[in-house]
Amino acid sequence: MPSLKDLRNRIASVKATQKITKAMQMVAAAKLRRAQEAAEAARPYSERMGSVLANITQAIGGGGDAPALMTGTGKDNVHLLVVCTAERGLCGGFNSQIARLARDHIRRLLADGKQVKIICVGKKGFDILRRDYASMILDRVDLREVKTLGFVNADAIAKKVIHLFNEGAFDICTLFYSQFKSVISQVPTAQQIIPAGVASAPAAAVDGGNAVYEYEPEPGEILSDLIPRNISVQVFRALLENAAGEMGAKMSAMDNATRNAGEMINKLSITYNRQRQAQITKELIEIISGAEAL
């Protein structure tokens, strides 16, 4: 049984931890608001970009004018996975859920005899995936020093992916991230970004219905410029969704930790008071017994 001094030290230690988790919860709440606004602002642009690409693709009928980034290599032997996670932990199962989705995808591909290559964006995903797939990891993108995510960060990742595609390093690229739904709900998502895949979009989903468009310059030339830009936009959206999801998960995790610390403090305080009461009672009995002996 721990002594009263040990219990006092444990209560003080848990109280100090509770102050830290409470402060981290408040910081995450402040950052969440900004991250959520950024993620929600990026969604309409990203969706509109997909709509424009679908319209142009219909205009050329998916013919020979379509760039390779849209049509693909015609093979699916080599898959590149861009796995986006957080740089830091203390956010519950946020990182492990994304990594689990990626690992399941890797296992399916390997079972089908495919070759897999990985780019890790974020330290936590890298730490998880390198345990079993270190030889498949081509690169790790470090964003720890980035205070505010910008389009330039996503563009650098997209250009790296496009460069690898142009060199024939892979056939299909899939982006893994967590889509932000709410503070308590982040959905791990896998999105194919190469080939772009908008050529297969249903006609009903394309804005404009039966409208006729005229393009200048030629649709193929427009696509050659828009598709790399669209890949950058999709990566940027994934990073913003991840940032909002991370802050939501961290806020929730720190709230749970703060409440658990409070419960632990209550239990330790009850134990401390009972032991102190028992000790006082024992001392009183000894004093009374001594007085009676006299």
UniProtKB/Swiss-Prot annotation:
Where, per UniProt, does this protein localize?
Cell inner membrane
Please give the biological process terms from Gene Ontology that the record holds. Answer: proton motive force-driven plasma membrane ATP synthesis
Q: What is its main location?
A: membrane
Which superkingdom does the taxonomy of this entry point to?
Bacteria
Q: Which Gene3D superfamilies match?
A: 3.40.1380.10, ATP synthase, gamma subunit, helix hairpin domain
Purpose of the protein: Produces ATP from ADP in the presence of a proton gradient across the membrane. The gamma chain is believed to be important in regulating ATPase activity and the flow of protons through the CF(0) complex.
Q: What is this protein called?
A: ATP synthase gamma chain
**Taxonomic source organism:** Mesorhizobium japonicum (strain LMG 29417 / CECT 9101 / MAFF 303099) (Mesorhizobium loti (strain MAFF 303099))
